[in-house]
Every structure is written in C-alpha cells, then in structure tokens.
Amino acid sequence: MRLLCGLWLWLSLLKVLQAQTPTPLPLPPPMQSFQGNQFQGEWFVLGLAGNSFRPEHRALLNAFTATFELSDDGRFEVWNAMTRGQHCDTWSYVLIPAAQPGQFTVDHGVEPGADREETRVVDSDYTQFALMLSRRHTSRLAVLRISLLGRSWLLPPGTLDQFICLGRAQGLSDDNIVFPDVTGWSPQASVC
C-alpha cells in the first residue's frame, strides 16, 4: 500500500511541476532574405532583452562590440569585446547555418552534451541595425535573449520600439530589458 501511495504522490508532484513550467512561445521566423555577406562586420550591442535579465543587471552591462566574420562554408565566427575599466573581456563562438537562411545553431566550443542554443536574425537593414533572437535550452528551462545591434550608436526611427515589441511578443517585460552603460565609453582599439 505504501508503494502505491508513494507512486501516486510522485506522479501528482510530477504533474504539478509540469504545469508550472511555462511552454516557450514560438520564435518569430528568421529574416527571409538574409544575406550573410552584408551582415558580416562589426556591430555595437545597443540593447539586450531576455528572461534571465533583471533590473539589477543593468549596472553590470558595459558597452561592447560583436564582430561577425563569414567563412566560405556559411559559418560565422563571432568575437565579442567588452571594456571593463582598463581591461577587455573577450569571448567567441561559431554560428553554424541551419535549414533556413538567417537561422543558426551556436557552437561555444565546449564539450559534447552542452546546452543546445539556436539563434536567428529576425530583421536587419545591414547598414544601421539588426535584431537577433537566441534561445538556449537547458535541462530545466529555455533561456531567451534578444540583441539590438547597430553599426553606430544612432538607430533609425522606430528601431527601439521594434526591439521592445519583439521582447514583449516573447513574453518579456520592461524589467527584462537592459541597455549598456555608455558613460565615458568610447571605442579604443588599444584596449580591446
């Protein structure tokens, strides 16, 4: 009898936990006319939105750049550089083309079995702005991140609204949006 009660309790808890795990919203499609050769180059990361960001993270985000280099096989090598005081933090990864143009899987260069991440370019005019959306699947949840990229710090009218609306369509609130602190920041090749 105890075994039966224990099994019933375990199954009940499993149902409760499954009900509390939100189903991720469907991702918007990647940009249909994506052109990798026009997308490559240096971008400033002007804003980030994600379900793991909180208001207290705003002070931690400094301005940074992302450089996309297109290889012959359609992969992008991506290098990021963020200044923190007098030193530079850098990290890199590879975007591997998926079935649709503008859609990629992310290779962080870690061991097999690491969390799976997919990313896509949702919109871009290639010369001024780009919106990218990434979703990383962990064993417990899906981590969503939306990046607002600009070739300069000046965005076309409506781009910021488009970024915020994309976040809201993915169930994010204004508290999930962070912008880098650019106080006193200027790109210096000697630092990074």
Curated annotation (Swiss-Prot):
This is Epididymal-specific lipocalin-12. Belongs to the calycin superfamily. Lipocalin family. Its main location: secreted. Binds all-trans retinoic acid and may act as a retinoid carrier protein within the epididymis. May play a role in male fertility. The keyword Disulfide bond applies. Residues 1-19 form the signal peptide. It is found in: Secreted. One of its GO terms (cellular component) is extracellular region. It comes from the Eukaryota. Disulfide bonds join 88-192. Monomer. It holds the Pfam family Lipocalin.
